[in-house]
């Protein structure tokens, strides 16, 4: 994958302030930030500010190659920076240095985080301590474009989480968002999708 990092490459430590971080229920940090020079320091500063506001920290692992490039730093951040880790199957396997998803699930016993993991057509798995939720993928016949499916899933999941819904509901919301995005060209979510989530 050749990801264009865009405006985040211009971020500096001076840009991460109490005003820019604010006091939301959660912030999402993309793993791709680690690909810029000050990335880890930017993430740490955002975490320090957010923690002071009682804000939860979600980390998206972005892609498996990104994980391989920064595995040790990601591992450290997952251990002491992130409350929620969002990843697909390849990304979580890369982080935990396993060859298959079942081994990764077993390895999660050593972590305290909430892990929200997608498995493409196999659906998603949420692990929080002893609780595990397995959510099947929606049956979509006409898949046009999978660009943004993981991001849409993450958005739906976090929407449920910040609204204090059950992990089952969070997984359903993520699945619904992803299933809508893959039926269109491009990753832009239609405005009516929020209304659909609220009616699920």
Please report, for each region that a protein language model flagged, where it lies by residue.
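Conserved phosphate-binding/catalytic loop of the ribokinase/pfkB sugar-kinase fold
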Residues: 1-40
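Thr-Gly-centered strand-to-loop micro-motif
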Residues: 2, 29-30, 60-61, 143, ...
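A residue-level structural signature of the nucleotidyltransferase/glycosyltransferase Rossmann-like core
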Residues: 8, 83-84, 93, 114-116
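Conserved phosphate-binding/catalytic region of the ribokinase-like
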Residues: 10, 48-52, 72, 98-200
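Conserved beta-alpha-beta core of the PfkB/ribokinase-like small-molecule kinase fold
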Residues: 26-106, 122-124
């Amino acid at each position: 994958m050749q990801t264009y990092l865009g405006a985040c490459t211009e971020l500096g430590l001076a840009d991460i302030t109490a005003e820019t971080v604010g006091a939301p229920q959660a912030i999402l940090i993309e793993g791709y930030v680690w690909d810029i020079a000050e990335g880890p320091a930017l993430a740490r500063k955002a975490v320090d500010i957010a923690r002071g506001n009682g804000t939860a920290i979600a980390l998206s692992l972005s892609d498996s190659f990104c994980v391989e490039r920064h595995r040790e730093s990601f591992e450290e951040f997952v251990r002491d920076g992130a409350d929620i880790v969002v990843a697909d199957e390849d990304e979580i396997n890369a982080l935990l240095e396993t060859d298959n998803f079942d081994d990764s699930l077993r390895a999660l016993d050593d972590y305290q985080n909430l892990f929200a993991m997608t498995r493409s057509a196999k659906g998603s798995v949420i692990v929080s301590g002893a609780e595990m939720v397995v959510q099947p993928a929606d049956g979509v016949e006409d898949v046009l474009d999978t660009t943004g499916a993981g991001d849409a899933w993450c958005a739906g999941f976090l929407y449920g989480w910040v609204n204090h819904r059950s992990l089952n509901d969070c997984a359903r919301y993520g699945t619904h968002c992803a299933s809508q995005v893959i039926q269109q060209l491009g990753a832009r979510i239609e405005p009516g999708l929020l209304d659909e989530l609220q009616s699920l």
